[in-house]
Regions:
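Short beta-strands and strand-coil junctions in structured, solvent-facing domains, enriched
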Residues: 239-241, 262-263
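Gram-negative outer-membrane assembly/targeting C-terminal domains
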Residues: 261-287
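Short amphipathic alpha-helical signal-transduction/dimerization elements
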Residues: 139, 178, 254-261, 265
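Short, charged, low-complexity patches
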Residues: 131, 245-258
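Beta-lactam-recognizing serine transpeptidase/beta-lactamase-like catalytic domain environment
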Residues: 1-8, 13-239, 245, 277-287
Length: 287
């Protein structure tokens, strides 16, 4: 399969690592004013000036600045180790044609601006499969398990990436991102709680990025109360006139999740009426 820069879908992993290492709590304040910052001469911006956000709100609103501030308090080796553990830059151990490695450069070569941009998904690449597997760590209480294309009688042993407490905290952030006030209310699925993260990335063109070509992402899990599935959606060069992941990929996620959970006979865990949010405008994500 092809690989792509995953954009803002990487932000929850920076929040998780920051929680795991004790740098922050879910309610820790992070200053994003005035909506822009400079890292070694390179500007980084949010789509809106959010002021002070909690860590939870950084993920809910998809703040580049909030994510970068967390990332720059981490050591490059810590980020690299975590990215490697969730499968970035690693060839999937999967007997399936086309499984690809993606790109994650050695941490010793990272410049500060590269550490910053990798925190929101630029400067590394992954396949859609790798992203879905990475998000399974939040669905499985912080454990990453081997993937198989055939059903197994017993769940395989995995590796511990985050504590169950960290995974639970991030699941709540993902639920906030997929709700009113988040970047993807259109991901909501009647009858089920869902959580996930949008991503929108400029496409690479030559040695830089195309100004008007995008990839739109949404990666999430459901039900949040007891995750059964992880779904990753990527739309290449959306042609509807809108390109944010919350507007393009999230509705596809919603349809797939609803149909799949019903096929699996998963009982609803949410009130249908309380989830009708189609008229609630999504927050435009920063990317």
């Amino acid at each position: 399969t092809d690989t792509f820069e995953p954009g803002s879908t990487m932000k929850p992993f920076i929040a998780a690592l920051s929680l795991e290492t004790g740098r922050v709590r879910p309610d820790s304040p992070i200053v994003s004013s005035p909506g822009s910052m400079v890292v070694t001469g390179f500007p980084i911006r949010d789509s809106h000036p959010y002021g002070t956000l909690t860590v939870e709100q950084v993920i809910q609103k998809s703040s580049n600045i909030g994510t970068v501030r967390m990332a720059m308090n981490l050591q490059p080796r810590e980020m690299w180790d975590m990215f490697s553990q969730i499968g970035m830059g690693q060839k999937p151990q999967l007997d399936f044609p086309g499984a690809v490695t993606g790109r994650l450069r050695p941490y010793k070569t990272w410049r500060p601006i590269e550490q910053a941009t990798m925190s929101y998904g630029y400067g590394l690449s992954a396949s859609l499969f790798q992203l879905a597997r990475a998000y399974s760590v939040f669905a499985r209480d912080g454990e990453l398990v081997p993937v198989s294309v055939v059903r197994r009688d017993a769940p395989p042993a995995g590796i511990r990436v985050f504590t169950p407490e960290t995974a639970s905290a991030v699941r709540h952030m993902l639920q906030m991102a997929a709700g009113p006030g988040g970047t993807a209310p259109l991901a909501q699925t009647p009858g089920y709680t869902v959580g996930g993260k949008t991503g929108t990335a400029h496409k690479q063109e030559g040695r830089g990025y195309a100004g008007n070509k995008y990839r739109s992402w949404f990666v999430g899990l459901a039900p949040v109360s007891n995750p059964r599935i992880v779904v990753a959606v990527m739309v290449d060069e959306p042609s509807t006139g809108v390109y944010y992941g919350g507007a393009v990929a999230a509705p596809v996620f919603s349809q797939v999740v609803g149909q799949t959970l019903r096929l699996l006979n998963v009982p609803p865990d949410a009130d249908v009426k309380s989830q009708i949010v189609a008229k609630v405008p999504a927050v435009e994500e920063s990317f």
